[in-house]
A protein has these predicted regions:
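SF2 helicase catalytic motif II
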Residues: 103-106, 114-159
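Conserved Walker A/P-loop ATP-binding site and its immediately adjacent core
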Residues: 38, 42-81, 104, 164-168
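Short glycine/proline-enriched coil/turn segments at helix->beta-strand junctions
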Residues: 29-32, 48-54, 68-73, 122, ...
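Walker A/P-loop
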Residues: 21, 25-48
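Well-ordered, non-membrane alpha-helical segments in soluble/globular domains
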Residues: 13-22, 82-86, 108-115, 140-148
């Protein structure tokens, strides 16, 4: 089993370009990605991937702007109802829909999926972007960890960060 793989991103390339050179069409599953640099288009890569996705981002402005730029995408955060999410899922059931959410909005997606009888754990890929925020922000934003209760139940998943927290070595 492979535990560590490096994909080099050349000057002028995006994350998707490096993946394609390595024979991957989109973000691999069941991995933790340290992309080293922000702004390489990893989230864009998932937004254009031919699969149903839940993308967790730490901030509302990011999910709003990304959802506006992509078809079959819905931003889920405070003020978006479970009914709206369920309606979106019904309308896009046969498409590669993208649900962008804050960690706090994840529960709405979970409830909407249950309401329309979609098994999110088998039908969707989940990407936790800026996953370092789980550790950095939990002391003042306890609900940021809520999606982790479900994360490992997904068959297809990935954590990604340009600024991961490196564990301290034991002395």
């Amino acid at each position: 089993m492979e535990y560590d793989r490096t994909y080099s991103i050349r000057k002028g390339e995006y994350f998707a370009d490096a993946l394609k050179r390595a024979g991957k069409d989109f973000i691999p599953t069941n991995c933790i990605i340290n992309k080293l640099l922000p702004g390489l288009g990893a989230t864009h890569c998932e937004l254009t991937a031919p699969r149903k996705s839940i993308i967790i981002e730490p901030n509302v402005p990011v999910i709003e702007s990304k959802a506006k730029k992509h078809k079959n995408a819905l931003a889920v955060y405070k003020g978006v109802t479970i009914r709206k999410v369920a309606d979106f899922l019904e309308e896009n059931r046969d498409k590669h829909y993208k649900l962008l959410t804050t960690p706090e909005g994840f529960t709405k997606i979970k409830e909407a999926m249950q309401a329309v009888e979609i098994d999110m754990y088998t039908e969707c890929f989940i990407l936790f972007d800026e996953c370092e925020k789980l550790v950095q922000d939990v002391h003042y934003r306890d609900s940021i960890r809520e999606p982790m209760n479900d994360f490992f139940r997904f068959q297809n998943k990935a954590l990604i960060s340009a600024t991961p927290i490196i564990p301290e070595k034991d002395n």
